[in-house]
Amino acid sequence: MAVKEKIDRTASHYDAENIQVLKGLEAVRKRPGMYIGSTSASGLHHLVYEVVDNSIDEALAGHATEISVTIHKDDSITVVDDGRGIPVDIHPTEGLPGVELAMTVLHAGGKFDKNSYKVSGGLHGVGVSVVNALSSQLKVWVRRDGKVHYMDFNRGTTITQLKVVGTVAKNDTGTKVWFKPDDLIFTDLTYKYDTLANRMRELAYLNKGVGISLTDEREGQEKSETFLARGGLQEMVQFLNARSKPLHAEVVYIDTTHDDIGIEIAFQYNDGYNENVFSFVNNINTHEGGTHLTGFKSGLTRVINQYLGRSSINKKDKEAKLSGDDVREGLTAVLSVKVHEPQFEGQTKTKLGNSEVEGAVTSVMNELLNRYLDEHPKVANIIIEKAISASRAREAARKARDLTRKKSALDVGNLPGKLADCSLSDPVLCELYLVEGDSAGGSAKMGRNRNFQAILPLRGKIINVEKARIDKVLSNEEIRTIITAIGAGIRDDFSLESTRYHKIILMVDADVDGAHIRTLLLTFLFRQMPELIEAGYIYLAQPPLYRVAKGKEEYYAYDEKERDDLIARMGGNDGRTSVNIQRYKGLGEMNPDQLWKTTMDPNTRTLLKVNVEDAVLADQIFQTLMGDDVEPRRQFIEANAKFVSNLDV
């Protein structure tokens, strides 16, 4: 997806010869993935985000306080705001009403004009015109100057020219957009309420004082919520820490402007061992971090070390040099910056590159956090004690950590897990199977393609990293084996470029124990190597549940429906030859040839790629299911038990 770019409307090259390039929506319909990422569920939801981003831009400019989103019975969407309303006057050079330009021209909008919007949200920035292009129908009502103006469109083409359809009070302004996604474009036309709710909640936290309501009118799913966070990021941190035990009641909060950059920071420590830091730029979730996050982390480390130096703590602890990992253990933090012209980079264009932002955030941390700690010594001492405790654990883990650092490819020969490596060395071509059990590991080793497939058998269940400190995590032999085999390190030592395999495949039994082992592995990867998930390197193998055979015919089924369909297709037990059905309870029940054919052969296997669409929600779920607190886990199970379709008892 392309990042928002600024168009200079006064530039000499923006003339008639450029109109076709800038205005053609046909390119959007031909290659929608370039504009919204995909035509699956992700892209479908992105249409809503794009329209809501326009309303949020009005809020950022101080002109909107209420936004409503409605999912109608036919999965069409309405978004309403109380902003100024999209301009309806005729554009001086284009000869079209402003609203028609916004709806039919890529990159046409006030957000590209510094005088209209100082900052604007939305990652790709192509505007609501893309929503128009990818909708079978779109209608827009603009409340402005005491009148209600109306237009409608069909697949990006204007059907009804701008006209006045009603009157309102002079101070009643805003925009209403209704659209129905095009079934010729999207493979899935069903909106997920929870997906939209998570984003609306996030936007409410990031834009304090703006109320965002979400209503579902679909039969049997009727629901409505309003998200409003007057405390902004403070409330977001409280939400994130709801399933943890905070070490101090008050959320540390900074909200200021430095060199024309808006900086909002909120954080709170809990008694856990994981670091949960979320960063945003102009409401965009910067999954890959960037200069703002670097400024926050370095500033936090420096300030806490400075405070340690002037504190009244004992001399031995006072001499400790706290690392970034030490001061961020148990930290839940949210950082949001507002930048006029953000420069994005990285694999998914979600990494901030503006160098000036790092200095601004560091300066703010140095000045305001130092002042806060001096004014709140009780909170400061809690943070210091937590960091010192982490430092001691880090020192205890140092030797174990050193064992995990892969110096060369020769190191794998000493792996306690007996890695069967592949002969190719190009990480792009290589795959690593993490296999449950020695028995299945043996079958996988014999059945694999030795050129590009490596096998690492795992003995038993690894440690639950959600409940353990880093020294305990690294004392676990299986964990050390996995880290060394992958070769990229963990946490601050992690380097994606050093990863030895670009496909890391979790292959476990299709039973409760297998699911538990898979969950433990995913917890470890999410907490210690999240970059692997973000890069799309983590996959789940899908071994079959059944072997269905009749005579010389042999097929494999991955669920009960597929099994029953196969039995019916094979004629069932026709009296001459009976159908033989084998239920696989473990990978070890398959011989090497069967394991290759069903689960490992790139031409016939099915792999599920692990991705994190909502990092906040993923963090909450891992805390709930894998953390110490039993009550939230019980509530989660009670609420979701009805959705379980495959239960081993």
Task: Name each model-derived stretch.
Residues 30-49:
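Conserved short strand/loop->alpha-helix "switch" segment adjacent to the catalytic nucleotide/phosphoryl-transfer site
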